[in-house]
């Protein structure tokens, strides 16, 4: 620990140059600082002893001399020898066994016992001090080869001799394209042949593909494009920049709006004869009927006041950005008002037929009959979003590379191919819910149909008295070696017999519920009609429990060590279990009027929701407190010595009573609310209004007698060793627990068709639908020609001695491999500053900045006698 502390001190000394925290450090001629046991922080040199075993110097040169080592030259001593720079004080631990450089001899002991030492300096070499920022350049002997160290994250890029040809390496996912010699004859490689399995019509297969198959991307389920009757007119939706016009009465045909760059052709009602639109510079020559009164012409900045027929009711005016289209009576054909820069077109009476003139570049659009509804035109980049009726299921859009999955008619039955390792799962009727598979150690929780009435579990020694239904014909008992003869219905068509290890599962008509076939050592159970509810059979040592009428709810029995897991209704909030010393904080419903708190020995039973009837476990001496519905107002009982205190309304301020020794404080004005000061032992007596119903306080030993409502059903109290039977709500269906040796026989719904279990050597005979065309069976030596999908690129097989030339993608940068004797030339990042290590005998030659003034060096014969002040 001492060494660690001193090393931390050294770190502080080296870093805090500006504070000159160098006290307690001794400087040697090389510029290293050693203090206390800090020599353990340095690496030992070759040939030296480990720290603490022998006084052998451990030295590591410092390349940078910190500022604090520029010693101060003011001493209180009368004699100030040149070249000696003692510190003003020492660290508390100074004087411990310390390692110094070879020429250094310690000069100080503990302060209290200090005696001056006559110190000699052989061949004194000047100690050099540098400015704080100076980094001296180290020179090395010509033969020195530095060992370079790198940062941990540095990944070196090796260099190679000119003649080196690297062996290329590739990423793990790279699949090389193999080239072959011209004389190579490709031998196709096939997967082991396995006939295609066929399945009943209701089987929905999981399709698998060969390893090289490039799977089509999976998309959201395909929804076909809805087809509409010829008269269907879709409602078009527009991009976000579209500003829809207000909706009008059915007879109004709206003016369409388009993207900003669109110049629309205005559509008009059927009776309107259109006026041409011209460029802004076009001035038409207007002709009028004899009765027309011309409208005066105005300067360009004039904002015309629109004139309307006498029956027109004008709409309010809006701010400039708003372009209001006024509504007019049916016979009026009006143009809208526009911003100031717009040159308005003249308005004419309804019967006016203008002579239209066009600019030379104008291409007229054809005129249509009155019933024609024009098709909207959009900018070239506009892609309309079509809206559909609520029942429309859109067809999804796919990327260009999407290859659609073929759709088939509902009656299509696909023929599925599987990989060699595929193990077919038995097919079930559509209503069948598959049985989950679990690890070998899994003990299943048996699930029953809603009508299932569980039978209790018994200890292993229980012998049951078996009861059967009136129609039950008992199965005779056979010796263990008996192999039962399977019975079939009259319509059964027997399948061919198989070798001994195989037991064929008979096929039955659809209504028949057959039992599975088992290995030879299995004692088969009898098969029953679907409506039969089997009686569970038990081992010979089992003692049966009598059967009860359907309305009987059995009391579950458990082994002596069984601790039942209590099940509560969904609304139940469980009470946490606490250590015996826990004092629970009681929570109440919102309408609950709390009873008074009790002294420490009393353990309060929390109240639960109204529907929950819970039995809490208490010590034997405890008399349980009843729980009430939220609206119950308890009648409080008191001991005979109780004197009730009156209760008061909320606005009542009680008159405080004081003990005889109380000295009242002076009275204050009404606004002042004074808190009385009382002696420490004072307990004020509260006064209450007449309507107050007091809460009783009891002595510590008082056990309250609780009164209950008439509908309350008390639960008995039990001794501490009693393990109570859990009470459940009426709808609770208990989970039956069985002894460890009990193997449960699962019960299934009437429609369940069991999955047969076979011997390990059993190979099932596949059943095929009527449309199945079987593939021929081949001899073991037959190698079929494999058919692949169109996109399949076969991977050829080669002779064992063939070494393919691998082709790589253009962006691949190979990682070369080298001969074992190759020593790469290491390259470094530009910012890397190597940490240089030196041989043990190397003494660096120090170089100095131009402004450096060396301190005086002394001849070898100089032996200064150092005297220290008395406070040392």
Curated annotation (Swiss-Prot):
Almost exclusively composed of repeats of a decapeptide. The keyword Lipid biosynthesis does not apply. Residues 273-282, 291-302, 361-372, 391-402, 451-462, 471-482, 541-552, 641-652 have a biased composition (Pro residues). The gene is FP1. Residues 213-221 are annotated as: Nonapeptide 2. Residues 273-781 are annotated as: Disordered. Residues 124-871 are annotated as: 69 X 10 AA tandem repeats of Y-[KRQ]-[PSTAHQR]-K-[AIPTSKGV]-[STR]-Y-[PTSVA]-[PSTQA]-[STYIPAQ]. Provides adhesiveness to the mussel's foot. Mussels produce one of the strongest water insoluble glues. The mussel's adhesive is a bundle of threads, called a byssus, formed by a fibrous collagenous core coated with adhesive proteins. Keywords: Hydroxylation, Repeat, Secreted, Signal. Produced by the byssal gland. Hydroxylated on proline (mono- or dihydroxylation) and tyrosine residues (to L-DOPA = 3',4'-dihydroxyphenylalanine) of the tandem repeats. One of its GO terms (cellular component) is extracellular region. Its main location: secreted. The keyword Secreted applies. Residues 320-360, 377-390, 403-450, 501-540, 568-590, 600-640, 677-690, 698-719, 754-763 have a biased composition (Low complexity). Residues 1-20 form the signal peptide. Residues 21-41 are annotated as: Nonrepetitive linker. InterPro entries: Adhesive_plaq. Sequence repeats lie at residues 124-133, 134-143, 144-153, 154-163, 174-183, 184-192, 193-202, 203-212, 213-221, 222-231, 232-241, 242-251, 252-261, 262-271, 272-281, 282-291, 292-301, 302-311, 312-321, 322-331, 332-341, 342-351, 352-361, 362-371, 372-381, 382-391, 402-411, 412-421, 422-431, 432-441, 442-451, 452-461, 462-471, 472-481, 482-491, 502-511, 512-521, 522-531, 532-541, 542-551, 552-561, 562-571, 572-581, 582-591, 602-611, 612-621, 622-631, 632-641, 642-651, 652-661, 662-671, 672-681, 682-691, 702-711, 712-721, 722-731, 732-741, 742-751, 752-761, 762-771, 772-781, 782-791, 792-801, 812-821, 822-831, 832-841, 842-851, 852-861, 862-871. It is found in: Secreted. This is Adhesive plaque matrix protein.
């Amino acid at each position: 620990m001492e060494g660690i502390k001193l090393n931390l001190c050294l770190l502080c000394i080296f870093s805090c140059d500006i504070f000159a925290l160098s006290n307690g450090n001794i400087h040697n001629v090389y510029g290293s600082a050693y203090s206390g046991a800090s020599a353990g922080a340095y690496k030992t040199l070759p040939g030296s002893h480990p720290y603490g075993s022998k006084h052998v110097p451990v030295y590591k040169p410092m390349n940078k001399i910190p500022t604090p080592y520029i010693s101060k030259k003011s001493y209180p001593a009368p004699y100030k020898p040149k070249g000696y720079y003692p510190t003003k004080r020492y660290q508390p631990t100074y004087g411990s066994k310390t390692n110094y450089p070879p020429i250094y001899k310690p000069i100080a002991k503990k302060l209290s016992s200090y005696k001056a030492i006559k110190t000699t300096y052989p061949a004194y070499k000047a100690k050099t001090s540098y400015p704080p920022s100076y980094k001296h350049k180290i020179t090395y002997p010509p033969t020195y080869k530095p060992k370079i160290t790198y940062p941990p994250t540095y990944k070196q890029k090796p260099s190679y001799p000119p003649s080196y040809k690297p062996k290329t390496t590739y990423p793990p996912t790279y699949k090389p394209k193999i080239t072959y010699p011209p004389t190579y004859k490709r031998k196709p490689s096939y997967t082991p042949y396995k006939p295609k399995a066929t399945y009943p019509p209701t089987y929905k297969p999981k399709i698998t593909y060969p390893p090289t198959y490039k799977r089509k991307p999976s998309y959201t389920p395909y929804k076909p494009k809805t087809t509409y009757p010829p008269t269907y007119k879709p409602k078009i939706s527009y991009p976000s920049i579209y500003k829809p016009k207000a909706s009008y009465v059915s007879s109004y045909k709206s003016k369409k709006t388009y993207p900003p760059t669109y110049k629309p052709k205005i559509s008009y009602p059927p009776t309107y004869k259109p006026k041409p639109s011209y460029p802004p510079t076009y001035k038409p020559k207007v002709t009028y009927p004899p009765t027309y009164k011309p409208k005066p012409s105005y300067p360009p900045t004039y904002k015309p006041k629109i004139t309307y027929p006498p029956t027109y009711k004008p709409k309010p005016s809006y701010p400039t950005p708003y372009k209001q289209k006024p509504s007019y009576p049916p016979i009026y054909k009006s143009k809208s008002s526009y911003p100031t820069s717009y040159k308005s077109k003249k308005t004419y009476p309804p019967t006016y037929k203008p002579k239209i003139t066009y600019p030379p570049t104008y291409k007229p659009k054809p005129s249509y009959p009155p019933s024609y509804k024009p098709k909207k035109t959009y900018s070239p980049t506009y892609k309309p979003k079509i809206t559909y009726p609520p029942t429309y299921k859109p067809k999804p859009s796919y990327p260009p590379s999407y290859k659609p999955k073929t759709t088939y008619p509902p009656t299509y039955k696909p023929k599925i191919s599987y990989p060699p390792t595929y193990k077919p799962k038995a097919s079930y009727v559509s209503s069948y819910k598959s049985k989950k598979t679990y690890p070998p150690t899994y003990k299943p929780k048996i699930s029953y149909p809603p009508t299932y009435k569980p039978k209790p579990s018994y200890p292993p020694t229980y012998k049951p008295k078996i009861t059967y239904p009136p129609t039950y014909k008992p199965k005779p008992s056979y010796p263990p070696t008996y192999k039962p003869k399977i019975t079939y219905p009259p319509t059964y068509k027997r399948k061919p017999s198989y070798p001994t290890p195989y037991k064929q599962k008979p096929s039955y008509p659809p209504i028949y519920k057959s039992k599975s076939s088992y290995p030879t050592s299995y004692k088969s159970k009898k098969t029953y009609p679907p409506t039969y509810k089997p009686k569970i059979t038990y081992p010979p040592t089992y003692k049966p429990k009598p059967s009860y009428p359907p309305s009987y709810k059995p009391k579950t029995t458990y082994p002596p060590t069984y601790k039942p897991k209590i099940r509560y209704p969904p609304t139940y909030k469980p009470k946490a279990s606490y250590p015996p010393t826990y004092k629970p904080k009681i929570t109440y419903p919102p309408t609950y009027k709390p009873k008074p708190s009790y002294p420490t020995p009393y353990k309060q039973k929390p109240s639960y929701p109204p529907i929950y009837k819970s039995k809490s476990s208490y010590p034997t001496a405890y008399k349980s407190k009843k729980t009430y519905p939220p609206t119950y107002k308890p009648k409080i009982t008191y001991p005979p010595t109780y004197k009730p205190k009156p209760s008061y309304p909320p606005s009542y301020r009680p008159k405080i009573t004081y003990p005889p020794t109380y000295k009242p404080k002076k009275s204050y004005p009404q606004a002042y609310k004074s808190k009385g000061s009382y002696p420490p032992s004072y307990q004020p007596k509260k006064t209450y209004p007449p309507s107050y119903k007091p809460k009783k306080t009891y002595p510590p030993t008082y056990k309250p007698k609780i009164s209950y409502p008439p509908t309350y059903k008390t639960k008995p109290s039990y001794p501490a060793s009693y393990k109570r039977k859990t009470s459940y709500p009426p709808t609770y269906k208990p989970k039956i627990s069985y002894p460890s040796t009990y193997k449960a026989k699962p019960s299934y719904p009437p429609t369940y068709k069991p999955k047969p279990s076979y011997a390990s050597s059993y190979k099932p005979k596949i059943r095929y639908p009527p449309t199945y065309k079987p593939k021929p069976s081949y001899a073991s030596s037959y190698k079929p020609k494999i058919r692949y999908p169109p996109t399949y690129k076969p991977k050829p097989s080669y002779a064992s001695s063939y070494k393919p030339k691998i082709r790589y993608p253009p962006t691949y940068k190979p990682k070369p491999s080298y001969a074992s004797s190759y020593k790469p030339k290491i390259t470094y990042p530009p910012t890397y500053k190597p940490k240089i290590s030196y041989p043990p005998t190397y003494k660096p030659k120090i170089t100095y900045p131009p402004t450096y003034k060396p301190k005086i060096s002394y001849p070898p014969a100089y032996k200064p006698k150092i005297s220290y002040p008395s406070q040392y």
